[in-house]
Amino acid sequence: MLRHITFTVFITTSMNTLATGMVPETSVLLVDEKRGEASINIKNTDDHPSLLYTTIVDLPESNKSIRLIPTQPVIRVEAGQVQQVRFLLQATVPLQSEELKRVTFEGIPPKDDKSSRVTVSIRQDLPVLIHPASLPEERETWKFLEWRKNGDQIEISNPSNYVVRMTLQFKTLPSGKTGAINKTYFLPHTSTTTALTNATDTKVEFYPASRYGYRGNKYVTDLK
């Protein structure tokens, strides 16, 4: 019996990623509240047409009252063609701090009941950064992070109105001991704790991520 089977491959695009299928033009979707909308170009790099499915995904900490709605959640994209996907921002009150969500783009190839081949659908997963109209632009958001000793733990907090993104690992200085956090982002006014490996260290070294998810130069700050 002839069978046609489709598998989905899930790709998180946060740094430089090479991929096939439906490929976004950038590694992050930036949304400005002033405009009330955003758009991104998606290219179908396959040699066949596919249906492009666009889905906004809330993080566990996301503000569910802030909604970003794709105007065309499902659309056919021909082979080699570029499709612009537009999003509308909906919020009940003006935003005071940045919001982080995710968006997935998945290309579903046409079904051929007479074929026995196995096809693979690629799902791209990008961060969505929503910036309030009243908040000044800030490129170096990581400088707002506060690192404090608390017993045998380090408490890392983000008291700012900005989303901060960084790599998972960091070092405490001068010992050079390595530590790690459990996620690569800090939403505004959130904090986390991790193990303190050397109580005498007074500095922290880590690598922040740019707005587009690229790893920046190392940054050193106080461990209080």
Swiss-Prot record:
GO cellular component: outer membrane-bounded periplasmic space
Signal peptide: 1-19
BP GO annotations: cell wall organization; chaperone-mediated protein folding
Record-stated family: Belongs to the periplasmic pilus chaperone family.
Subcellular location: Periplasm
Annotated gene: yhcA
Protein name, UniProt field: Uncharacterized fimbrial chaperone YhcA
Coiled coil: none
Top-level taxon of the source organism: Bacteria
Functional description taken from the UniProt entry: Could be required for the biogenesis of a putative fimbria.
Species whose genome carries this gene: Escherichia coli (strain K12)
Pfam (any one): PapD_N
Protein keywords: Chaperone, Fimbrium biogenesis, Immunoglobulin domain, Periplasm, Signal
Gene Ontology MF terms in the entry: protein folding chaperone
UniProt xrefs under InterPro entries: Ig-like_fold, PapD-like_sf, Periplasmic_pilus_chap, Pili_assmbl_chap_C_dom_sf, Pili_assmbl_chaperone_N
NCBIfam families (UniProt xref): PRK09918.1
